Amino acid sequence: MGSAEARLTLASTSPQRRAILEQLAIPFEVVPPDYVEDDPPDADAVELVRRHAEGKAHSVHIEGRITLGVDTTVLLDGRIYGKAADREHAGRILRELSGRTHTVVSGVCLLGGSTDVLEHATTGVTFRALAPEVIDAYLQSREWEGRAGAYAIQGLGGRLVEGLDGDYLNVVGLPGALLVSILERSAPKLLQIPR
């Protein structure tokens, strides 16, 4: 594969991950992963996101291609917060995150580069103390649907945040700094700036 044809296969249907790759000018194609996430109740968040990222990448990987799998979750007091099942569940999650600092953890798996890589990134996110009417208004927006931790920092969910410690893009859904570091080591041709 020549550098003009170099393209990453993204094992994800996430519009946020696509937008981040576009922002970073990394050429890619999307292939929805054929992977079922199983979340044991006693799972370690880092092990979980790494396993899911690897499973997603392997589910679509074709020899000779470079494939990226990513998984993101939210962690507070040792408890994993995935996507809310419904509005009531989303409200419960937001009340628990209110006024506290939680951790966003993403696993990143790259297959098919000079070496296969499986790493993770963490970002601390502090929510301001949320009044019930703020939570209700956010729930009405439905932006929480399909989001780890029941919020989207890049949208209205940014209003809920007081501070950030780490990579903002990780909270959106793909740790950009970690991805660039991995690509520099394993697939630098994907980082060539288009002319």
Regions found by a protein language model. Name each.
Residues 13, 33, 113:
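Cofactor-binding loop segments of dinucleotide-utilizing enzymes, especially the Rossmann-like FAD-
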Residues 25-42, 116-122:
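Short glycine-rich, Thr/Ser-proximal phosphate-binding strand/loop in the N-terminal lobe
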Residues 15, 35, 176:
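Short, glycine/serine-rich, charged loops/turns that create anion-binding
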Residues 2-25:
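N-terminal beta1-alpha1 ligand-phosphate binding loop
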Residues 18, 28-29, 102, 191:
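Residue-level marker of intrinsically disordered, low-complexity segments enriched
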Residues 2-9, 42-195:
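Anionic-ligand binding patches
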